[in-house]
Amino acid sequence: MTKSISIEHLQFDEKGLIPAIVQDHQSGQVLTLAYMNSDSITKTIETNETWFYSRKRQELWNKGATSGNKQTVKQISFDCDADAVLVLVDAQGPACHTGEESCFYEDLYKNDVALLQIIPQVSAKIKERHEHPVEGAYTSYLFEKGVDKILKKIGEEATEVVIAAKNEDKQELTSELSDLLYHSLVLMEQQGVTLEDIKKELYKRHVEKEGQQRE
C-alpha cells in the first residue's frame, strides 16, 4: 500500500464522504461498497485495515472488529475525478454481514463475461475454507486430512480424465476436468501457490519466450 497518498486530492461530497469500492486483490471480486471520510482513510492507511464511516450511526467502524472478518489493505487508488476510491484487500472471511463472501451476491443481469471470473472466485472460496474451516465442508475436510489426501484425489481425478477422453465423452470429460482443476486449486492453496504465480509462469513460457524468438 502506498503510504504517501495525498488525501487532499480526493473530492469528498458535501457530507465529507467518498464511496469506497472494496475488491479482493487476488480474485478481483468486488466485495462491498462502503463510505469513507478523511479520518477513516487516514486510519486505514495507518493500520493497514479497512475503516469506514457509518452513515446510519455516524461513526467510524473497523471491518472485522466484531466478526473477526478483517480486511488487510494492499492498495488504495482513486478514480480520474478523485471522487471514488478503490481499496484492494486480502479478506480474512466474508465481506457481507449475511455471511456471503461478497455483498454483491444477487444478480440483476448476467452474461457469459461473468464466467471469466469463476476460477478466481473458486480459488478465493478455497482460500477462505482453508483459513476459516467450516465443519462438514468438503474443501475444509481436504485441508484437514492434508497433502496426501489431496494428492490422492488429484491422482484419482487425473485417471478419470484419461478414461473420459478415451471414451470420447465430451460431457464426462468436461466434468472430470472440472474436478481435476478444483483439486489442483486446493493443492495450490495448500502449497502456497497462487493463480498469479501460474499466470507469471505461463507469461514467461508463452509471451516472453515468443518475443525472444522474434528478436
UniProtKB/Swiss-Prot annotation:
EC numbers listed for it are 3.5.4.19, 3.6.1.31
Q: Which keywords belong to this entry?
A: Amino-acid biosynthesis, ATP-binding, Cytoplasm, Histidine biosynthesis, Hydrolase, Multifunctional enzyme, Nucleotide-binding
Q: Which reaction does it catalyse?
A: 1-(5-phospho-beta-D-ribosyl)-ATP + H2O = 1-(5-phospho-beta-D-ribosyl)-5'-AMP + diphosphate + H(+); 1-(5-phospho-beta-D-ribosyl)-5'-AMP + H2O = 1-(5-phospho-beta-D-ribosyl)-5-[(5-phospho-beta-D-ribosylamino)methylideneamino]imidazole-4-carboxamide
Which GO terms are recorded in the biological process aspect for this UniProt protein? L-histidine biosynthetic process
Provide the primary localization.
cytoplasm
Q: Where is this region: Phosphoribosyl-AMP cyclohydrolase?
A: 1-118
Instruction: From the Swiss-Prot or TrEMBL record, state where the protein is found.
Output: Cytoplasm
Similarity field: In the N-terminal section; belongs to the PRA-CH family. In the C-terminal section; belongs to the PRA-PH family.
What name does the UniProt record give this protein?
Histidine biosynthesis bifunctional protein HisIE
